[in-house]
Regions:
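Membrane-interface transmembrane helices that cradle and orient dolichyl/undecaprenyl
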Residues: 38-57, 86-95
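Aromatic-rich transmembrane-lumenal/periplasmic boundary elements in polytopic membrane proteins
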Residues: 172-223
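Aromatic- and kink-enriched transmembrane "portal" helix at the membrane-lumen/periplasm boundary
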Residues: 9-32, 65-73, 115-140
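Transmembrane-helix signature of polytopic, membrane-embedded enzymes
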Residues: 1-14, 33, 49-56
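Membrane-interfacial entry segments at the cytosolic side of transmembrane helices
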Residues: 53-55, 92-104, 136-146, 163-178
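Alpha-helical transmembrane segments
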Residues: 40-44, 83-87, 110-120, 151-165
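Alpha-helical transmembrane segments of multi-pass membrane proteins
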Residues: 25, 29-40, 58-61, 77-80
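Transmembrane-embedded, aromatic-rich helix segments that form part
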Residues: 34, 73-86, 150-151
Length: 223
């Protein structure tokens, strides 16, 4: 195992892909770092899977994936590998059916994060913002604040209820979602920076509505 790990690490170290990413002024070096750290974390979980505290590694992975979204969406492609490591550890007697189901579930999880959580949170916050400002007449950012208060309340209730009912999988899922959102919250820096009226303020994502357009890359138009 160590020999194969050393061979893989050395092959990547001296590969053209790695050095090209390392010397260019782009996001791919940091993206490679997060991909490596996330996969390292799932291997640490695999070592301690039978430990009562092994869940913390999965929660760490959720947080790192959330943070990595702010670097590059390419990091989400590590999710299928993570799911397969989980499958092979939890189900030693693997089958073709189980392998296929795990692959499908990994794609579904990837789609939920990519097309659901990432745009969904900002879109809902934007809808709340428009409603509470235009329909009710509250000050700017009121809708966004109310949305996140409700989101936090829903997460707290989910954690409390799942713990009370002894639903360990649901509790872990809600906890993973919480840490994914915490990691994803790095995008708030765009709003903070834009409201500071910096000299370079492309597309001015000053609120949830503008951030939604920014994340949707609407500034590039359609081809």
């Amino acid at each position: 195992v160590f020999a194969s790990g050393i061979v893989g690490a050395m092959a990547y170290t001296f590969s053209d892909t790695f050095w090209y990413s390392a010397v260019e002024g782009e996001v791919y070096a940091m993206s490679s770092f997060f991909t490596a750290v996330v996969f390292w974390a799932i291997l640490k979980w695999e070592e301690q899977a039978d430990s009562p505290h092994s869940l913390r590694w999965l929660i760490l992975i959720a947080y790192l994936i959330g943070v990595s979204i702010g670097v590059h969406l390419l990091n989400l492609l590590a999710i299928p590998a993570i799911v397969y490591v989980y499958y092979f550890k939890k189900y030693p007697k693997t089958t073709t059916k189980g392998f296929i189901i795990s692959g499908v579930l990994s794609v579904v999880l990837l789609a939920v994060i990519l097309f659901g959580i990432i745009p969904g949170i900002v879109s809902l916050a934007g809808n709340f913002e428009v409603f509470f400002i235009n329909s009710i007449g509250l000050p700017f950012n009121s809708g966004t604040i109310i949305f996140f208060v409700l989101l936090i309340a829903a997460i707290v209730f989910g954690l409390w209820w799942s713990r009370k009912k002894g639903k360990a999988v649901l509790n872990a899922s809600v906890l993973a979602f919480l840490f994914l959102v915490i990691g994803y919250s790095t995008f708030f820096i765009l709003i903070i920076r834009s409201n500071a009226n910096t000299p370079i303020n492309e597309n001015a994502p000053k609120d949830a509505v503008a951030l939604r357009a920014y994340l949707g890359r609407e500034q590039y138009g359609s081809t």
